[in-house]
Structures are given as C-alpha cells and as structure tokens.
C-alpha cells in the first residue's frame, strides 16, 4: 500500500484564475471525479481562495484536503486573516490548509504601495500573530 496523495491546483501557476465560485465548483467536481485527494486555489486576480473554499463547504466529501496556494500576507491583517481562515475551516469540516507567503517585491511595492523592508521578519511576525 502506498501513501501517495495527489492534488489539483487551479489558479496562477495553472495559467488561469477562477472567475467565479461556480467555476471553482466545476473544477473541484472534476478533481473529485478524477480521484484527486486535494484541491488547491491560488490567490490571483479572480475570486478570493479562502472565501471560495468556504463556499464549496462540504460539497466534495471525496476530497480530503482543500487549500490555498498561496495567500499573500502583505495587504492583510493577521486578525482578519485568522478569522477568515477559521470560518473557512469550519465550513469545510477541518480540511483547510492555509498556504501563506510574502508575495513579491514588485507586487508589494508596486501594486500595494507598501514597503518590502525585511519580508521574512514580516512573515514570521504575521504568522506568530495568526497563531
């Protein structure tokens, strides 16, 4: 017996973004029918991945894990992100994995107008606040 697990990631690295919750639902339905163990949504310019996964709720019992890959920390507050993740975790029956990261200097400074000073320290402090 093997412990291999396979997931489907949809979003930025997949070459597209999810434009709607219905599109995410169709993608998750495909993942479940194809036998994938997990379903992941990237944070990009489409729908919010955490809200979308919460909306999918328990529609797909054959998928053992749903997750974000990756939610950028800059531009969010730890309390708000923790509350959002906790709500989604409840909606999906404890199957959520929250993937987070700093994004890129170009995005943080250019799109958000924030300082890219010490991004790893920023991420560490943010994650500690989430806990």
For each feature predicted by the language model, list its residue ranges:
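Conserved strand-turn element in the central/C-terminal portion of the radical SAM core barrel
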Residues: 69-73
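N-terminal beta1-alpha1-beta2 module of alpha/beta enzyme domains
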Residues: 1-68
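Flexible, glycine-rich active-site loops centered on histidine and acidic residues
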Residues: 4-19, 75-131
């Amino acid at each position: 017996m093997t412990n291999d697990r396979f997931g489907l990631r949809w979003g930025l690295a997949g070459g597209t973004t999810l434009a709607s919750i219905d599109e995410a639902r169709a993608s998750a339905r495909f993942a479940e029918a194809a036998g994938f163990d997990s379903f992941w949504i990237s944070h990009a310019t489409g729908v919010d991945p955490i809200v979308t996964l919460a909306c999918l709720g328990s529609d797909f019992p054959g998928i053992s894990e749903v997750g974000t890959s990756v939610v950028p920390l800059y531009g969010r507050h730890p309390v708000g992100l923790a509350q959002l993740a906790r709500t989604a975790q409840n909606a999906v029956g404890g199957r959520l994995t929250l993937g987070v990261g700093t994004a890129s200097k170009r995005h943080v400074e250019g799109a958000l107008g924030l300082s890219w000073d010490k991004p790893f320290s920023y991420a560490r402090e943010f994650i500690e606040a989430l806990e």
